[in-house]
Amino acid sequence: MNSTPKAVVIFSGGQDSTTCLFQAIQEFGVENVEVVTFQYGQRHAIELEKAAWIAKDLGVKQTLIDTSVIKAITSNAMMEEREIKQEGNTPNTFVDGRNALFLLYTAIYAKGQGIRTIFTGVCETDFSGYPDCRDVFVKSMNVTLNLAMDYNFNIRTPLMYLTKKQTWALADKLGAFDYIRQHTHTCYLGVEGGCHTCPSCVLREKGLNEYLSEKTSGQKYV
């Protein structure tokens, strides 16, 4: 197999995964980076459309994996037309097992391609109550996959301890601020450009406004 180090990014076309994609490209070179996108039964096609467009625009190979069978065994507001709200300790947008499934399938694909490094944009700081965005989960999954496949994966989480403000700052540092602001999709309701009211849009815009405010006042990102 080719000995050149390569990386694969779990890619949705959103702010976080696109930031990770630019990070991977900076570290590994665009020719050594691939993305994996999942069709898991999400409510809106715009997510998949954005992911495909960005991958093509940046010149990275995209592999689309269908995991929509998950719709038959779990229920949530990400895959069904219902009101988005908090249910107990977890919002009803949480998809049980989604990140575990994404990491498993990406690892299977990566091993077949001789790739060891997997980037995912999960974040514990602004994780919205999703248990599978925690560092302890990702680390345990890394160990599990290594043992399950007898292969040394390295799951990278560049955004794990960043706030949304800091994620915007990282995008700026990577030279991708305008690109990510213009081309990525985050809205839970599937509105082009954002609905400005769903939890995901509110978090994204709050972080953006905080970063722009600090940037114009001359404060530096640490």
Swiss-Prot record:
Record field: catalytic activity: 7-carboxy-7-deazaguanine + NH4(+) + ATP = 7-cyano-7-deazaguanine + ADP + phosphate + H2O + H(+)
SUPFAM superfamilies: Adenine nucleotide alpha hydrolases-like
Gene3D superfamilies reported for this sequence: HUPs (3.40.50.620)
Molecular functions per Gene Ontology: ATP binding; ligase activity, forming carbon-nitrogen bonds; zinc ion binding
Alphabetical keyword list: ATP-binding, Ligase, Metal-binding, Nucleotide-binding, Queuosine biosynthesis, Zinc
Pathway this chain belongs to: Purine metabolism; 7-cyano-7-deazaguanine biosynthesis
EC number: 6.3.4.20
Cofactor note: Binds 1 zinc ion per subunit.
Class of enzymatic activity (EC top level): ligase
Pfam families: QueC
GO BP terms: queuosine biosynthetic process
Record CDD domains: QueC-like
Residues noted as binding Zn(2+) in the record, renumbered to the chain: 187, 195, 198, 201
Cofactor(s) annotated in UniProt: Zn(2+)
InterPro entries per the UniProt record, alphabetical: QueC, Rossmann-like_a/b/a_fold
Organism superkingdom: Bacteria
Binding site for ATP: 11-21
Stored HAMAP family: QueC
NCBIfam families, per the entry: 7-cyano-7-deazaguanine synthase QueC
Family the entry assigns: Belongs to the QueC family.
Function recorded in the entry: Catalyzes the ATP-dependent conversion of 7-carboxy-7-deazaguanine (CDG) to 7-cyano-7-deazaguanine (preQ(0)).
Name this protein carries in UniProt: 7-cyano-7-deazaguanine synthase
Taxonomic source organism: Actinobacillus pleuropneumoniae serotype 7 (strain AP76)
Gene name for this UniProt entry: queC
